[in-house]
């Protein structure tokens, strides 16, 4: 795996499809994708000449995500992580999105052909195991405009808009309203309690990765259950210099949402490769009226907000964050018999 991420050459069985060990490495990286409350709402099928991605409706958060928008976004992030991992290992992905109209859960089929990895592929793949969702306060250092421009250019390749939020006071008010609305929603709170503040679980948000929400922060955080992560010393949330970025699409159908997830992946990995801390923000987009307010504030009639992202520089005294858990590949990947024999 180290050689692959360092770009020292593709590991392949032949010129048509990667061998079993390469596929395993690819999917190990793919499932490191962030997802709403770390539900990991995906499953994979390995076929003789392709990889198939499916959503898991049983992992949909019915109160937090009633129409399944964030489920599709999460799977889009995993899809792009897979594409990046393949490229770093010497395989160009050919993605067919929603290939089966009769199966709404079948989100993508990924074919491959040989590819010589470039440095960008290698850098993005190397960022996958290093990326963390860092909900803590960031330092006061600003994010360079050129860095944001690169993220926007990469998102645009997939037809997704990235805009920096300039009116932070108004955005803070929108987010605070979403937090307030959720506090009075008993079903939402029950769901949040189930999926956060966890210890020793293979899914959900661990307590060790949750700081307490601070209302003085430029953008208030979600009120997770049982937060167990301390803020860095001598860091005031009010001085947080993070940039707030919004990803939006021209339409709001399932394809647009999947593409937005893919764009979120490339922005998060680009930020990580630059040494930036990052954190998706989805709470204000989970309620119709606050999502409409974000749309009016950032995109107007020209786009639908799909995800907000907080990007900035972690304080120099911030402790490294542990990785969040993932299910074993055996729980989320279906292997064909011939590749199972290769693994034995």
UniProtKB/Swiss-Prot annotation:
Gene3D superfamilies: NADH Oxidase. FMN binds at residues 40-44, 326. SUPFAM superfamilies: FMN-dependent nitroreductase-like (SSF55469). InterPro entries: Nitroreductase-like, Nitroreductase/BluB. This is Putative NAD(P)H nitroreductase Rv3131. Interacts with human TLR2. One of its GO terms (cellular component) is cytosol. The lineage of its organism: Bacteria, Bacillati, Actinomycetota, Actinomycetes, Mycobacteriales. Belongs to the nitroreductase family.
């Amino acid at each position: 795996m180290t050689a692959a991420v360092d770009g020292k050459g593709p590991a392949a069985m032949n010129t048509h499809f990667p061998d079993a060990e390469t596929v395993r490495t690819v999917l190990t990286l793919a499932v490191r994708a962030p997802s709403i409350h770390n539900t990991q709402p995906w499953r994979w099928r390995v076929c003789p000449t392709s990889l198939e991605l499916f959503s898991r409706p049983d992992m949909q958060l019915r109160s937090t995500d009633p129409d399944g928008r964030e489920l599709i976004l999460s799977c889009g992030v995993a899809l792009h992580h897979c594409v990046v991992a393949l490229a770093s290992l010497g395989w160009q992905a050919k993605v067919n999105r929603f290939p089966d109209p009769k199966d709404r859960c079948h989100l993508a089929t990924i074919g491959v052909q040989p590819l010589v990895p470039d440095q960008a592929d290698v850098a993005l793949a190397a960022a996958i195991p290093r990326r963390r969702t860092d909900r803590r306060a960031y330092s006061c250092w600003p994010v360079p405009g050129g860095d944001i421009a690169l993220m926007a250019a990469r998102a645009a390749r997939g037809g997704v808009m990235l805009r920096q939020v300039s009116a932070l006071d108004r955005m803070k008010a929108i987010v605070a309203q979403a937090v307030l609305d959720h506090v009075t929603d008993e079903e939402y709170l029950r769901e949040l309690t189930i999926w956060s503040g966890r210890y020793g679980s293979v899914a959900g948000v661990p307590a060790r990765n949750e700081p307490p929400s601070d209302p003085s922060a430029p953008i208030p955080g979600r009120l997770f259950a049982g937060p167990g992560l301390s803020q860095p010393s001598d860091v005031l949330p009010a001085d947080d210099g993070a940039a707030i970025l919004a990803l939006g699409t021209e339409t709001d159908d399932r394809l647009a949402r999947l593409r937005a997830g893919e764009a979120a992946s490339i922005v998060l990995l680009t930020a990580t490769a630059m040494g930036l801390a990052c954190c998706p923000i989805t709470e204000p987009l989970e309620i119709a009226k606050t999502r409409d307010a974000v749309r009016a504030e950032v995109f107007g009639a020209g786009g639908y907000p799909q995800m907000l992202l907080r990007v900035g520089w972690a304080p120099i005294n911030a402790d490294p964050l542990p990785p969040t858990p993932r299910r074993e590949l055996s729980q989320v990947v279906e292997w064909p018999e011939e590749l199972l024999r290769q693994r034995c």
